[in-house]
Amino acid sequence: MIKKLIHQATTLFVASVIATAALAAETVTVGGKFFTEQYILSEMTTQLLQAHSIPVKQITGMGSSLVRKAQENGEIDLYWEYTGTALIVYNKVTEQLSPKQTYNRVKELDGKKGLVWLKPSNANNTFALAVRKQDVAGNGLHTLSDLADAYRNKKEIKMAGTAEFIGRSDGIKNLQKAYDFRVPRSQLKSMEAGLTYTALKDGLVDVALVYATDGRIAAFDFELLKDDKQFFPSYAVVPVIRKETLEQYPELEVILNQLSVKLDDATMQRLNARVDIDKKSVRTVAAEFLTANNLL
């Protein structure tokens, strides 16, 4: 009888130890969307966690709504999100807010859903309109107000944008209202996102919709027109983590914030260009950046 009790107690103790160890070693799932910048951010995050002996797996190539839903459902623990996307798409807030207000609002709203927004980076992957630098001296375009003046003066300026940009609330329709101009239909070309860059580079259009941290901006020698009326929402990229994951691995806040403060527009442009233009692997680019910044 005593041996039986000892055996049962031993079995329960071993089971408890195994359960505790399994909990302690719970894997952190890092997510990512389906474009270069997100692959890089996801890979850097994964390498950082591995360097700190945190068990991690990576799921990338997901659509924006899918990765968000996966995080809310607990399938993804951590990924890098954009403040404007969270504000407008996920939380349905349409009022115009400053970058700081945008961050504070999504942090508050998502906090109620168990999602923690960590320190925002200075990388703002917002919409922008770009021109070729070689043309600036001749056309005098430096700001969106300059562009609006040119259209009001009936100058022929061909613009390339995506179908989404042409149709959405922070797209061309409200941009025209904010800056008081109109692009003639014949001068507005709708095309897939990647094609706007090549159309501008090849001289098929004069102005093109781009994303501010895209590596092709520097590689193709583009200049971004300053959004002097701050029309476009802030799309600061920020690590977002499930509250329960952060409670289990509180050191993640420091680890991820140390990476976040190293990122700005120029840095992300260079990293993206290393992959898209120089054809380096995402893993190599991530490792080189982390090493160069003493994060590994």
What residue ranges belong to the model's regions?
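Ligand-binding "clamshell"
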Residues: 90-118, 204, 216-230
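Beta->alpha turn/N-cap motifs
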Residues: 60-64, 74-87, 102, 193, ...
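A conserved helix-loop-strand patch within extracytoplasmic ligand-binding domains
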Residues: 101-158, 261-265
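Extracytoplasmic "Venus flytrap"
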Residues: 27-43, 60-64, 164-167
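A bilobed periplasmic-binding-protein/Venus flytrap-type ligand-binding module shared by bacterial periplasmic
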Residues: 127-137, 236-249
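Ligand-binding pocket segment of bilobal, Venus flytrap-like solute-binding proteins
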Residues: 154-227
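Short, polar/charged alpha-helical segment
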Residues: 36-55, 71, 173-177
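An extracytoplasmic/periplasmic, membrane-proximal ligand-sensing/linker region
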Residues: 37, 166-181, 250-296
